[in-house]
């Protein structure tokens, strides 16, 4: 008998639902209707009703939790074990191969040697799991009882994000970025993709499906540079992204739908979360390499009985009891990173024949060798020329580069407010180079006269316009020269180089999670038959969420905890805004460059002066009224349906 619920035993013992919660409901499969048999919330219902406390089915005072990897997924798992599973924090141990926690959420350096951030975070207000966690994590700089979310809201509510120079070309001229430039057939292709079932898209690439005109449109330039998609990446993942961010499509060109942190990703998220966990009592063992798991497999299931580690050069096996649990972060987007600086290019010590041998990938491969339920890691780590790119972090003292930056900034770069509002893409760059300056300082102890900029390029294997080398062959100074050329300040290059420290990072797997995939290539969070093992991170299957976000890492961690402990809680599916008629209508108009969509005039006529008039997108769609008004729009609608059906 559970002492927590003993007063409810009559109800619970008679319930067919108790102990059988669907922890990962799927909104793409659910018809939402209330019935006498329905007792749980709809699959994507969000809000405070979902904030009920988890009730453990047993005591975990003697259970040990081993979390392999201390990135955001692993840390989130620890948080949910503590908050919802009521597992004592002292029972939780991280096993981390590196000398520092945080995984891919890095941010380090100083003004003398230069700062480095391999990537950054473009955040969305609909990251329900991320904000669910960070509303409970004490703030980095505000006093108790304020949280990380409170800090995030405070700065973003009072400093709106937008870009005034999303695209530039012709040596620094701001290019018109007000239009998507999609023709009617390309708009219909997007709609057809949204209508397709996910099962139809196994192993298809974006260029398999979309036309050349789509791939040359402003829309695709906005999309690919914001999210780091390549033409050869997964069409399925692109579809999921379009559903996930449909509500934000009218902010795609000026980035006004984004909310950014005050500092870099490590100081904003990792530092306060790690501090919270350590104060609760979790154990973090750094420099501990996990090589394999000892899994007992029989007809009754799969049980982890040991963790094979390497510590101080010696193999050590950690026993795992039947009441213990193991969480593994599979794969890695930032392992095998190679670094360069002002005077040296990264020395790349990897190719397709040697890829996927680092710790995170090797562990996943060892699991996959035991059973097909653990997926196919080689689908993601075996083609690095299609999964890699290089970034550069610029630590800048005042120079001609900063003077030029001010022309593209919505606020003074030294004001602490939004600067570029996100990436600025150079459309005539052979490398398709983009750069950004987020709120400054980007590091808490950063000097007042220093700015930190970030640069990356999608076509790093192409010869530069100014420096006749590929980006990979370039030193930091040469990458800086290429940037200055595109900004029209190459004549002041000596001044810029003298005042700029460049640290580069080549990441062979940075978009490996975007590689084309099919059903079964990624394992489920709790693979079939696993009793005490959960897999988390960017390379596990969720119903409808996307990869390359902190939200998906937190989601997988939360699912793992709820499933393994069989808690009385669901992890709601992605925010349901994709089904909101307001956002669907807005998207239709936005894709058409704010010109009326088919049937808009009729809708405005029907809804004019009614309570629901406001659901229509902004902007009048005045059309000439005549006797055949309705017939004309019915015919247009028929043609539109024909187009969708292809």
UniProtKB/Swiss-Prot annotation:
Q: What is the effect of changing residue 265 to A?
A: Slight decrease in catalytic activity
What happens to activity at different temperatures?
Optimum temperature is 25 degrees Celsius.
- Could you say which cofactors this protein requires? FAD
As for pH, the annotation reads: Optimum pH is around 6.
List residues traversing the bilayer. Answer: none
Record Gene3D superfamilies: 3.30.9.80, FAD/NAD(P)-binding domain
Q: What is the effect of changing residue 122 to A?
A: Loss of catalytic activity
Single GO term (MF): oleate hydratase activity
Residue numbers binding FAD: 73, 96-97, 104, 122, 127, 290, 332, 549, 553
Q: What is the effect of changing residue 241 to F?
A: Loss of catalytic activity
Question: Is the Flavoprotein keyword given for this protein?
Answer: yes
Outline the segment boundaries, as ranges, of region: Disordered. 15-48
Instruction: Give the reaction(s) catalysed.
Output: (R)-10-hydroxyoctadecanoate = (9Z)-octadecenoate + H2O
Q: What induces it?
A: Strongly up-regulated in cells grown in the presence of oleate.
The record, for InterPro entries, names:
FAD/NAD-bd_sf (IPR036188), Oleate_hydratase (IPR010354)
Stretches with biased composition (Basic and acidic residues): 20-32
Keyword Disulfide bond part of the UniProt annotation: no
- Point to the regions of Polar residues compositional bias: 33-48
Query: What pathway is it annotated to?
Result: Lipid metabolism; fatty acid metabolism
Q: How is its activity regulated?
A: Is not inhibited by EDTA in vitro.
One Gene Ontology term from the biological process aspect of the record:
response to fatty acid
Q: How does it assemble?
A: Monomer.
The family assignment reads: Belongs to the oleate hydratase family.
Q: Function, please? A: Catalyzes the hydration of oleate at its cis-9-double bond to yield (R)-10-hydroxyoctadecanoate. The hydration of unsaturated fatty acids is suggested to be a detoxification mechanism and a survival strategy for living in fatty acid-rich environments.
Which protein, by its recorded name, is this?
Oleate hydratase
Biological source species: Elizabethkingia meningoseptica
List the taxonomic lineage.
Bacteria, Pseudomonadati, Bacteroidota, Flavobacteriia, Flavobacteriales
* Gene behind this protein: ohyA
């Amino acid at each position: 008998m559970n002492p927590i619920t003993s007063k409810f035993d009559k109800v619970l013992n008679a319930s067919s639902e108790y102990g059988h919660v669907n922890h990962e409901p799927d909104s793409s499969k659910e018809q939402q209707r209330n019935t006498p048999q329905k007792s749980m919330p709809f699959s994507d219902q969000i809000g405070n009703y979902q904030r009920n406390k988890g009730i453990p089915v047993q005591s975990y005072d003697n259970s040990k939790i081993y979390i392999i990897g201390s990135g955001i997924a692993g840390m989130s798992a620890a948080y949910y074990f503590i908050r919802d599973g009521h597992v004592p924090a002292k029972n939780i141990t991280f096993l981390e191969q590196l000398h520092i926690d945080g995984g891919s959420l890095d941010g380090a350096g100083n003004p003398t040697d230069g700062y480095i951030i391999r990537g950054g975070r473009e955040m969305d207000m609909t990251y329900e799991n991320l904000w669910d966690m960070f509303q409970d994590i004490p703030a980095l700089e505000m006093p108790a009882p304020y949280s990380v979310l409170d800090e995030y809201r405070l700065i973003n509510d009072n400093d709106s994000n937008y870009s005034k120079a999303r695209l530039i070309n012709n040596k620094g001229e701001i290019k018109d970025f007000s239009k998507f430039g999609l023709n009617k057939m390309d708009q219909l292709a997007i709609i057809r993709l949204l209508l397709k079932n996910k099962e139809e898209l196994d192993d298809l690439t974006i260029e398999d499906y979309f036309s050349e005109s789509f791939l040359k449109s402003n829309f695709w330039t906005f999309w690919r540079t914001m999210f780091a998609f390549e033409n050869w990446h997964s069409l399925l993942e692109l579809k999921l992204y379009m559903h996930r961010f449909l509500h934000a499509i009218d902010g795609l060109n000026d980035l006004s739908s984004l909310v950014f942190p005050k500092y870099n990703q490590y100081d904003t998220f990792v530092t306060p979360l790690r501090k919270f966990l350590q104060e609760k009592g979790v154990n973090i063992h750094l420099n501990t390499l996990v090589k394999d798991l000892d899994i007992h497999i029989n007809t009754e299931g799969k049980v982890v009985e040991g963790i094979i580690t390497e510590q101080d050069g010696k193999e050590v096996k950690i026993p795992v009891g039947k009441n213990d649990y193991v969480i593994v972060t599979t794969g890695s987007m930032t392992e095998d990173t190679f670094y360069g600086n002002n005077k040296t290019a990264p020395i790349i010590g990897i190719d397709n024949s040697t890829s996927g041998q680092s710790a995170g990938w090797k562990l996943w491969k060892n699991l996959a060798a035991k059973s097909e339920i653990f997926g196919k890691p080689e689908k993601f780590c075996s083609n690095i020329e299609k999964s890699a790119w290089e970034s550069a972090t610029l630590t800048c003292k005042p120079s001609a580069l900063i003077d030029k930056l001010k022309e593209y900034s919505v606020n003074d770069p030294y004001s602490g407010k939004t600067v570029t509002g996100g990436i600025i893409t150079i459309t005539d760059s052979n490398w398709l180079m983009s750069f950004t300056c987020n709120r400054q300082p980007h590091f808490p102890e950063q000097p007042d006269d220093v700015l930190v900029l970030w640069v990356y390029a999608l076509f790093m294997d192409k010869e530069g316009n100014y420096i006749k080398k590929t980006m990979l062959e370039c030193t930091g100074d040469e990458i800086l020269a290429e940037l200055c050329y595109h900004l029209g300040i190459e004549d002041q290059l000596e001044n810029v180089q003298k005042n700029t420290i460049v640290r580069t990072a080549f990441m062979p797997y940075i978009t490996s999670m975007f590689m084309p995939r099919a059903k079964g290539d990624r394992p489920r969070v709790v693979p079939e038959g696993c009793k005490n093992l959960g897999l988390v991170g960017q390379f596990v299957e969720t119903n409808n969420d996307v990869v390359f976000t902190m939200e998906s890492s937190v989601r997988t961690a939360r699912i793992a905890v709820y499933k393994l402990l069989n808690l009385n809680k669901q992890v709601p599916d992605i925010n349901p805004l994709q089904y909101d008629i307001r956002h669907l209508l807005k998207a239709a108009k936005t894709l058409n460059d704010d010109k009326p969509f088919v049937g808009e005039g009729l809708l405005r006529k029907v809804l004019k002066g009614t309570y629901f008039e406001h659901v229509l997108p902004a902007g009048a769609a005045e059309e000439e009224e005549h006797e055949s008004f309705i017939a004309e729009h019915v015919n247009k609608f028929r043609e539109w349906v024909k187009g969708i059906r292809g």
